[in-house]
């Protein structure tokens, strides 16, 4: 089993890099984990709708180039399904049991998602209706993936 997290933008803060490193280490017991960072597109504060759309399209193209053919694609999306940690672990287990050997989680840029990403998604996941910095969403996602594996393996985990 391999999990890839493809995200727009690079982690800048040391504490976030340390958290990603820690969860990568923890996850290595259960799965191969790969983190892919693609460049975010420059976007001034005031953009027209067309310019905003162009930024999202360019970021989506960068992400889509990194998705391996045959990978089960999970898109983090505010319009996606909200679930519990137990529900997420059940979903992850079902994906693995149905023969998928590679899952790619996609975290879009700060302006949102291009339609091309929505079209390729096998599943759209909403971590929360609250807004988080994309870098923090990466850490939250990794923690939930780790928690899901602990649930699947019936191992205890601090609640």
UniProtKB/Swiss-Prot annotation:
InterPro entries: Alpha/beta_knot_MTases (IPR029028), RlmH-like (IPR003742), tRNA_m1G_MTases_N (IPR029026). Keywords: Cytoplasm, Methyltransferase, rRNA processing, S-adenosyl-L-methionine, Transferase. One of its GO terms (cellular component) is cytoplasm. Pfam families: SPOUT_MTase. CDD domains: RlmH-like. It catalyses: pseudouridine(1915) in 23S rRNA + S-adenosyl-L-methionine = N(3)-methylpseudouridine(1915) in 23S rRNA + S-adenosyl-L-homocysteine + H(+). PANTHER family: METHYLTRANSFERASE, RIBOSOMAL RNA LARGE SUBUNIT METHYLTRANSFERASE H. Specifically methylates the pseudouridine at position 1915 (m3Psi1915) in 23S rRNA. This is Ribosomal RNA large subunit methyltransferase H.
């Amino acid at each position: 089993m391999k999990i890839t997290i493809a995200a727009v933008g690079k982690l800048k803060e040391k504490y976030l890099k340390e958290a990603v490193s820690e969860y990568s280490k923890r996850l290595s017991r259960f799965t191969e984990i790969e983190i892919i960072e693609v460049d975010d597109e420059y976007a001034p504060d005031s953009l027209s709708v067309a310019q905003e759309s162009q930024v999202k399209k360019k970021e989506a193209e960068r992400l889509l180039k990194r998705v391996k053919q045959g990978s089960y694609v999970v898109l983090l999306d505010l319009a996606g399904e909200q679930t519990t940690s137990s529900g997420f672990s059940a979903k992850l287990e079902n994906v693995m049991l149905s023969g998928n050997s590679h899952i790619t989680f996609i975290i879009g840029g700060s302006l949102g998602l291009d339609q091309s990403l929505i079209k390729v998604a096998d599943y759209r996941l909403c971590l929360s209706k609250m807004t988080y910095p994309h870098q923090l969403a990466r850490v939250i996602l990794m923690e939930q993936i780790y928690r899901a594996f602990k649930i699947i393996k019936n191992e205890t985990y601090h609640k």
